[in-house]
Amino acid sequence: MVAVRGAHLKENTTFELVSWVESLRQDAKVSSRIEGTYQRCIELAAEQENGPLLLWRGRELVEILVTLSMDADTLIAALLYPLVEGGCYSTDALKEEYSGTILHLVQGVEQMCAISQLKSTAEETAQAAQVDNIRRMLLSMVDDFRCVVIKLAERICNLREVKDQPDEVRRAAAQECANIYAPLANRLGIGQLKWEIEDYAFRYQHPDTYKQIAKQLSERRIDREDYITHFVDDLSDAMKASNIRAEVQGRPKHIYSIWRKMQKKSLEFDELFDVRAVRIVAEELQDCYAALGVVHTKYRHLPKEFDDYVANPKPNGYQSIHTVVLGPEGKTIEIQIRTKQMHEESELGVAAHWKYKEGTASGGAQSAYDEKINWLRKLLAWQEEMSDSGEMLDELRSQVFDDRVYAFTPKGDVVDLPSNATPLDFAYHIHSEVGHRCIGAKVEGRIVPFTYHLQMGDQVEIITQKEPNPSRDWLNPNLGFVTSSRARAKVHAWFRKQDRDKNIIAGKEILEAELVKIHATLKDAQYYAAKRFNVKSPEELYAGIGSGDLRINQVINHINALVNKPTAEEEDQQLLEKLSEASNKQATSHKKPQRDAVVVEGVDNLMTHLARCCQPIPGDDIQGFVTQGRGISVHRMDCEQLEELRHHAPERIIDTVWGGGFVGNYTITVRVTASERNGLLKELTNTLMNEKVKVAGMKSRVDYKKQMSIMDFELELTDLEVLGRVLKRIEQVKDVAEAKRLYG
C-alpha cells in the first residue's frame, strides 16, 4: 500500500462553494465563517489576473489543515494568506476586517519567507537585513506554532502547483523543501505533512529512481494487498481471542522512505521488510505490550529489527513499538504498535497538542511556558539540522542564534534579547517602570545576581518594589549590570529626570575619581572638555556625567589624550629622522617615487593616517599634525580637534594635499534622521547597495521627544563626489528628514 495525494489544480471546472464547505465537515459556526471569508476572497480576487489561482491556493491550504484538525482561526488565516501574499489585500485592511489573531497568523507566515532568503551574500547590509527578518520569524514561530503549520501546508501547495513547470523550477522548489521544510515538519512530528513534502521533493529531484520504485510497487500491488488483507484478518482474530482492544490495519508506505531505507541498508527492493507493513492501534498502553506478546507468539520475529520508541521516544516525540516478523510463506512484515493518542500525535505532531488543549484552561501559565520551552527546543534542533544541509550561512546562523537569547516571562511570553543579557535588561525590555523598580530576579525559581547572563529558554521573574530606585552603577559597563543599549537608554532617561543638583554632585565625584587615575585635575577637565562636549560650565559637565548623558570613559579618554601627550622635542626628533630617511631613499633610488594618498609638503612616501575625529576624504581641504610614532595625522581644515591642536602646538601643524595615485575607500560617518516606520532600514540599506557603497557599521537610537529615529552609518567611500551623491539618494527615501556627514 503506497500513499498518494495528488494535486487538485484544475482549469475550466465549476466550483460549488456550499458543497466544498460541507466537505470540510466543520460545525455550523466554523462553516459559516469559512463561507463568509471565501465570499470576501472572491471579491478581492475578482480584479486579479491570477485570481482563480490565488483562490485555489487558499482552498488547498484549508483542505490540508482540516486533516490536521486545526482551529477556525487557522483555517480563516490560510484562506486569506494567498491574497495578502499576492498583493490583493493589505495587512491594514486585514486588521480592520478581521481579528488580531488572524492578522498575527498571516504576518507570521509572511515572516517565515525569511527562510527562503537565506542565500549566500557578501553584502553586510543584506546579511543584517536577513538576520533581522529571521529574528522576527523565530519570535512568531515560538509565540504561535500555527503559522508554521500554515507555511508547511503552503509549501505542499507550491510543490503540487509546480508539477507541470520546467525541470529547473521543480528542482529548485524540491531542494528548498528537502533541506528546510521536511526537517521542520519532522521536528514538529507532523508525519502527515512530512511524507508528502519528502515524496514530492524526491520525485522532482530523482524522477527516474522515483518512477522505478513506483513501477516495482505497482507490478506486485494486487498480490501484496491480498497478502496484507489475509495477514490483517488473521492477526485481528488473534487479538480478539486474547481480549485485546486493538485495530489492525494495513499501513501505507511512502516512496521516499522506501528509497532511503534501500540506501541506508544497501538493500535491493525485494529485500525490504517494510514494503509489507501493518499497524496495530490499541486503546491503552498496556494493550500495546499485550499485542506485542501475541505477535511474537504467533510469528517468529527478527530481534535485530526490534525498536521500542514508547520507552525511548525519538527527539521529535514520536512513540511506537517497531518489530519485524516472518509471516506466511516466510515473507517479512514490519509491524508498528501504538495507542490511538500516539498515532494521532505521530500524524499531527504539535497540531495534536493544540487539538487536546483547545477548549480547556488546564495547565495555566506554567503549562504555556513548558509548551513554549519544548517548542523552542524543537526549533533550535531544526536550525542545527538545516545548517547541516549547507543551506544556511554559518555567519548568519551565528548572528541569529548565538548572538540572541530567547527568554520567557512567567506567563510564557517570549522575550528576544541580545546575548549576555542580564535580568535588568529583561526587566527594562518588559517596561521602563519594571526596570526602575527592580530589586531582584529569579531564574527557574532561583534568586540570581543582576550580573547573571540569561540562557536560551530561561524563565525569568522580576522582583520589584513600590518606588523606582535605579542605581548609577547600572550605567558602569565594567560592572556588567546592564548590557543592552535599550536598557541603558532607559536608565539614562530616568536619571535625567532627577534633581539636577544630585546629578552635579554625583557627576563631580565620578569625574574626580577618574581624573586621579590619569594624574589630571578638575581644571584640566573644564579646559579640555568644555568645547569638545559642548558644555558651557563646569556644572553642566558634572550634570551630564551624573545623568549619564556624557559617557565618563569618553570624557576621560579625551582629557588623557591632551593632558598626557608627548613633548614637542620627542615628536620633532622622530619626524626629523623620518624625513631624513625618506630623503636618503629618494637620493639613492633611481625609481620613480610611489605616490600615496596624501602628500606632505611636496615629499612623498611619508607615513600618514586619516584622523578618526573628522574622517577626511578626497575633495576635503586638509592639514597634517605630527604625532608621536604614528607619522602625520591628516585632519579636515575645519576639524574642531585640529583647531585645538593649532592653538596648543602650532609648530606641529604641516601642510598636506591629496595625492593623485591612490585608489581606495575611506570610512566616514553619515547620520540619517527620519520618522519611525516599518521597512525604513531596509529601504536605506537597499539604497546604499544600489550605490555600491559598503556599510562598515551602523548604530541607531530613537529621539522619543521628537519621535524621530537617528541612524549613524559608517560608510566606505572613494571621494567627496560619491558622498554628495549618496546623501542626495538617501534624502530621496520616504520619511527621511535629513542625511548629513558627521565630523566627529
UniProtKB/Swiss-Prot annotation:
PROSITE patterns, alphabetized: ACT (PS51671), HD (PS51831), TGS (PS51880)
Keyword Nucleotide-binding found: yes
Pathway(s) the chain acts in: Purine metabolism; ppGpp biosynthesis; ppGpp from GTP: step 1/2
Summary of the function given for this chain in its UniProt record: In eubacteria ppGpp (guanosine 3'-diphosphate 5'-diphosphate) is a mediator of the stringent response that coordinates a variety of cellular activities in response to changes in nutritional abundance. This enzyme catalyzes the formation of pppGpp which is then hydrolyzed to form ppGpp. Also plays a role in the reductive division that occurs during the initial phase of nutrient starvation.
Enzyme superclass (EC): transferase
Entry protein name: GTP pyrophosphokinase
Keywords: ATP-binding, GTP-binding, Kinase, Nucleotide-binding, Transferase
Pfam families recorded: ACT_4, HD_4, RelA_AH_RIS, RelA_SpoT, TGS
GO molecular function, one term: GTP diphosphokinase activity
Annotated ranges, domain HD: 54-159
TGS domain ranges (all copies): 403-464
Assigned protein family: Belongs to the RelA/SpoT family.
Origin superkingdom: Bacteria
This protein's record includes keyword GTP-binding: yes
Gene disruption: observed consequences: Mutants remain rod shaped, and do not acquire the typical coccoid morphology usually seen during starvation.
Reaction(s) catalysed by this chain's protein: GTP + ATP = guanosine 3'-diphosphate 5'-triphosphate + AMP
Native organism taxonomy: Bacteria, Pseudomonadati, Pseudomonadota, Gammaproteobacteria, Vibrionales
GO BP, one annotated term: response to starvation
Organism of origin: Photobacterium angustum (strain S14 / CCUG 15956) (Vibrio sp. (strain S14 / CCUG 15956))
Enzyme Commission numbers on file: 2.7.6.5
